[in-house]
UniProtKB/Swiss-Prot annotation:
Membrane-crossing residue ranges in chain numbering: 10-27, 34-53, 63-85, 92-114, 155-177, 387-404, 408-430, 443-465, 475-497, 504-526, 539-561
Name of the molecule in the record: Uncharacterized transporter SO_2143
Database matches in PANTHER family: K(+)_H(+) ANTIPORTER SUBUNIT KHTT, PTHR30445:SF9
Annotated ranges, domain RCK C-terminal: 204-288, 290-377
GO process annotations (BP): potassium ion transport
Keywords: Cell membrane, Membrane, Repeat, Transmembrane, Transmembrane helix, Transport
NCBIfam families reported in the protein's UniProt record: Asp_Ala_antiprt, YidE_YbjL_dupl
Annotated localization: Cell membrane
Molecular function in Gene Ontology: monoatomic cation transmembrane transporter activity
PROSITE patterns per UniProt: RCK_C (PS51202)
Similarity section: Belongs to the AAE transporter (TC 2.A.81) family.
């Protein structure tokens, strides 16, 4: 044991990786559906390892924290800007109000309990499950120019307060949002989602049509077939809730170019793409059509791609509006993903598309290539990263954040951390217009998000290790009880405001609350309770605004309390 202690003291970098190894391994274990998660497990592992009195350079913590904050900003840029634009403004304003509750109640609880700045910073981060705020709070405390011993004591209790309150902050938030609040507000989530679908043009038949396997068949029309005499547009209009398109036409023995006004005649052979059971419903009399194998009409390549939306003309349009255009002909929309968590958005006629959305499309290659040019660009997820863009963004953000302005004796600064977060937002938003540069692969964003944060957490835990037990004794068991209060009340008041002031539909209300508190685990439980992903419609904008504000609150609460 002495050998291990001495080795870790000489090579503190080993202690960091040991904390990560234990943290990720333990954090991924589940017991009856509950897991600590990598962040909490890494912190606890680091605290235990920190009992060896290991000295770790603060630069390690700072470098990885800046990487993490850039990834946070980069992931939510388009959604954040969308949130403060016209279409997302109600949800963005709600997120601001919810975040104010998340700031107010922890401060009140901490004041009543008599916690110092360090304990309050950790208490806020744990109860609101926003680990990133600890970094900004730490920077703010550093700029207060307090005596070294007092600052050291504050830094040592931050992880104590965080670790004790984070567990209920995570699990409790999910239970409160998915179980307790629906009962208190008398919300039947499943019924609410069905009502939302009905009001926004969604039906069981419609949803089924969006996801059905694409098929391409050719039919020869006889004089008894209902399609004879119709234009192609009129034929396709026979399937208002089903995806069926004429993809080719052979007239008088020749394959000809078609448009919506082309007329169908007896003896024509048409290639029909879409749902096979829908074909059968229309061509319901065997003597009125012959299914043929016209190889020239059927030999058309099918393509499935992910498209990154960048078009100004598409931004904010509903699927119903886009579906009325001729450009949507032959296109099957399989999936909509939005935000840094790639939240899957329900496909409904009134669902709006925004820049930064990723659409999974399928259809004939000619149709997919045509519509891709109008929507944006194919989301080509290469392995190489634009490192120059990434590093330059961090430099610009850190330089701006390093500026300090004093009002009396009070220093006002974004800090390098806050500056990098904002730089990530801005650079990501710019990239949504020009996706040809600044590409950071999704696995790399995950690495910076997860490992960047956990190295920072490990550094905090290792440094606080020697004083952790003393800090826990000082704060006592009441810290956990105060944490329950500070976690629950902001969620309850946010739900009340969302229902009675913003008048959100019950189907998306709890998704808005989960987003404003950046608790993805809660969204999963809410969707499971609702048996639908409709609540996800309230998550992405509020998550973008909430993630930004809750992180910045780490700085703000120190300024308020001083």
């Amino acid at each position: 044991m002495n050998w291990l202690k001495t080795t870790l003291q000489i090579y503190p970098e080993i202690a960091v990786f040991l904390s990560l190894a234990i943290g990720y391994w333990v954090g991924n274990k589940t017991f009856k559906g509950f897991s600590l998660g990598a962040v909490t497990a890494t912190l606890l592992a680091a605290v235990v390892i920190g009992q060896f009195d290991i000295t770790l350079s603060s630069n390690v913590k700072s470098i990885f924290f800046l990487m993490f904050l850039f990834a946070v900003g980069y992931g939510i840029g388009p959604q954040f800007v969308q949130g403060i634009a016209k279409d997302g403004l109600p949800q963005a304003l709600f997120a601001v109000v919810a975040c104010l509750f998340s700031l107010l109640f922890p401060i009140l609880c901490a004041k009543i309990a008599g916690y110092d700045l360090g304990a309050t910073a950790g208490f806020f981060a744990g109860t609101q499950t926003i680990s990133a705020s600890m970094g900004l709070a730490t920077d703010a405390i550093v700029h207060l120019d307090l005596p070294a011993e007092e600052s050291k004591k504050m830094f040592s209790v931050i992880p104590v307060a965080y670790a004790v309150t984070y567990i209920f902050g995570t699990v409790g938030s999910a239970i409160v949002l998915a179980q307790i609040i629906p009962k208190l507000l008398r919300i039947d989530l499943e019924a609410a989602c069905k009502d939302y679908m009905a009001k926004n043009g969604g039906t069981t038949e419609n949803a089924r049509g969006e996801w059905h396997t694409y098929a391409l068949r050719s039919y020869k029309l006889t004089e008894k077939n209902r399609a004879v005499g119709m234009t192609i547009h009129e034929f396709e209009a026979q399937f208002p809730h089903r995806k069926v398109f004429v993809e080719g036409l052979r007239h008088e023995g020749k394959v000809i170019d078609t448009d919506p006004n082309s007329k169908l005649s007896t003896g024509d052979i048409i290639a029909v793409g879409g749902e096979y059971d829908a074909f059968v419903e229309f061509f319901d009399h065997p003597d009125s059509f012959d299914e043929t194998q016209d190889s020239e009409l059927l030999n058309q390549p099918v393509l499935g791609v992910d498209v990154y939306v960048t078009s100004r003309g598409i931004n904010g349009k509903t699927l119903a509006e886009l579906g009325k255009t001729t450009s949507s002909h032959g296109i099957f929309l399989r999936k909509i993903k939005r935000g840094p968590k790639a939240i899957e958005i329900p496909i409904l006629p009134q669902t709006r598309l925004f820049r930064g959305d990723i659409l999974t499309l399928s259809g004939l290659t000619k149709d997919v290539e045509r519509v891709t040019k109008q929507l944006g660009v194919i989301d080509q997820r290469g392995n190489s990263m634009d490192v120059a863009f990434w590093a330059f963004a961090i430099v610009i953000g850190a330089l701006l954040g390093s500026l300090v302005f004093k009002i009396g004796n009070l220093p006002l600064t974004l800090s390098t951390a806050g500056g990098v977060l904002i730089a990530g937002l801005i650079f990501s938003w710019v990239r949504s217009f020009h996706p040809t540069f600044g590409w950071v692969p999704e696995p790399t964003v995950w690495f910076m998000n997860s490992v960047g944060l956990n190295v920072f957490i490990a550094a905090i835990g290792i440094s606080a290790g020697p004083n952790f037990v003393a800090g826990l004794k000082e704060l006592g068991f009441s810290l956990f009880l105060w944490g329950v209060v500070a976690t629950t009340l902001p969620l309850f008041f946010a739900a009340l405001v969302g229902k009675y002031v913003f008048k959100f539909h019950p189907a998306i209300l709890l998704g808005c609350c989960a987003g404003a508190r950046t608790t993805t685990a809660s969204l999963g439980m809410i969707n499971e309770k609702a048996k639908s992903n409709i609540p996800s419609l309230g998550y992405t904008i509020t998550y973008a605004v909430g993630n930004t504000l809750l992180t910045m609150w780490g700085l703000v609460l120190i300024l308020i309390l001083t």
